[in-house]
Structure formats: structure tokens, C-alpha cells
Amino acid sequence: AMLPQRSQVASEDYPLSRRLYFYLPANAKPQARALAEFAQSPAGQAIVAQLGFVSQQVKAQPVPPQADMPPRYRTLAKHAQRLSVNFRFQEGSASLDNKALRDVQRVAEYLRQAGKLQSKAVLVGFGDPKETPGRAALLSRLRALAVRRELARDGVDVLEVTGMGDELPVAGNDQEQGRLRNRRVEVWVY
């Protein structure tokens, strides 16, 4: 059993976390657009946090090293902190999903404010099992490289990109929904 922790809900690692969507028609009124933009802005997310809900504000948090972690991941846990954001992808693709595109801006701004734009971030990609050995590791690395490319557009110079393949799943792989949750990229900072 996994207890709900804010960091796991924010990163969507907690199994019961769900996204809240704002749908606007193409000809939306300016007030509706303004509300949707404000809700996703730093000021709007500050209100979300103030009211006791889990916001999309990026935070760095330590992760206790565990003996069963892969060696590279355990080293990160010992020396770096994990950001409260996971990048996820469109189904069957290495293209970032709509939330991840906004998260690129949030992460870049967090790193800018923390003075960590240059060679302080590590991207760790994960995936679901594949029949061909090494394919999961390759695909997870390609996803992490896609995130690096987007972060670079916002001035972030990533220190390292790695793919962990199907290690450390956050959901079961027996259904497509679980496999989608496992296809993620974490951000760690020194």
C-alpha cells in the first residue's frame, strides 16, 4: 500500500492522482481564457497551495536512498534532490503531452530562480517492458532526450541524460494505463 504524499501526487506517481483539465472552445470568451491562464499561473497555483490542495509549483525534495534502487539512481538519491515534476508523453510517442509542455516552462523557471540553469539538472527516463532486450532502456533515454531538447529551448543546460528502462515502475504494466504512467522522465538537481 502506498500512502498519498504531496510529492507523489504532484509528480503523478501516486496511483489515484488525476489531472484537472480546462477545456475551452476555439472561440472562448476572453474571461474564460483569462481564468484558465490564471489557474495555471504561479499566482493561481499559489492559491491552490494556500487552500491545501496539491499545486503544480515545482519543489526539490530529497529521496531517501534504498538498497533496492539501481546503483545510478541510488547515487542520485544520495547527492541530488528530485523535482516534484514528471514529464509524460502522448500515447505511443516521444512527444511531450500537454501538461509536460507547461511543465517545461515551470521547471526552467524554477531552475532559473534557483541558479541551476547550467549543468545542475539530471534527466532520468523510464518506460515499460519491451520484448527486445535493451529496447526499454533506449526508449526511456529517447524520452529523456526529448525533454532535454525542450528545456534547452528555455535556456537549461542539462548535466546528464539517462534511461533506466523498465526499472522502478510506478504502476503495473498489465494494462495500457499503467504502462503510460511508467513512461516518464524525472528531473533531479544538484
Question: Where on the chain are the PLM-derived regions?
Answer:
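Periplasmic OmpA-like peptidoglycan-binding domain that tethers envelope proteins to the cell wall
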Residues: 112, 116-117, 126-190
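Exported/periplasmic ABC-transporter solute-binding proteins
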Residues: 1-102, 106-118, 124, 145, ...
